[in-house]
């Protein structure tokens, strides 16, 4: 369905994926009048990268600024799991020795901002840890595990369509 666009808007957001719709949602707290916020989307909500890659909710990033942003984002997902179609099951990064130093750095940075996670080191300890979760675990060569206690996954396409539907009056195209 082709909608007519307003001739002016206070805010124009390009893209109706997770970033665009989340931005529109937050800005709708400030801009209350219909048409003040316009979201332009060339295809459909969650049709691009957001519909493919944004279902995993985690805080496993190398950049400290991104880690702080994602810690905040995880708290938003946790604020209403039912509405967001969010499943708080945690997140595991299971790594070989070549990644040990980087994963250890992520763990230290998570601890520094109070993000709950556990770091397991050594092949034997990693094997025991994973067998405690999956009794039939068999993978070899794992020397570190970063277990984020928060995080999980969301049914992102359903969630984004619901977010679009629940936004205050604005143009979403």
Question: Whereabouts are the PLM-identified features?
Answer:
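Short, flexible hinge/linker loops that cap or flank conserved catalytic cores
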Residues: 4-6, 31, 86
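Short beta-strand/turn micro-motifs composed of small residues
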Residues: 15, 41, 95
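Glycine-rich FAD pyrophosphate-binding loop
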Residues: 28-50
């Amino acid at each position: 369905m082709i909608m007519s666009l307003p001739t002016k808007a206070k805010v124009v957001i390009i893209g109706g994926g997770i970033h665009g719709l989340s931005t529109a949602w937050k800005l709708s707290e400030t801009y209350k009048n219909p048409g003040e916020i316009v979201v332009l989307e060339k295809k459909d909500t969650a049709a691009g990268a957001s519909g493919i890659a944004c279902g995993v909710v985690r805080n496993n990033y190398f950049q400290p600024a991104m880690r702080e942003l994602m810690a905040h984002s995880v708290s938003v997902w946790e604020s209403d799991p039912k509405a967001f179609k969010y499943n708080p099951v945690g997140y595991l990064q299971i790594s070989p020795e070549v990644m040990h130093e980087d994963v250890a750095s992520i763990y230290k940075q998570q601890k520094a901002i109070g993000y709950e996670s556990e770091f397991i080191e050594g092949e034997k300890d990693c094997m025991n840890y994973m067998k405690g979760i999956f009794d039939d675990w068999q993978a070899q060569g794992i020397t570190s595990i970063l277990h984020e206690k928060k995080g999980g996954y969301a049914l992102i396409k359903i969630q984004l369509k619901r977010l679009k539907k629940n936004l205050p009056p604005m143009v979403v195209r």
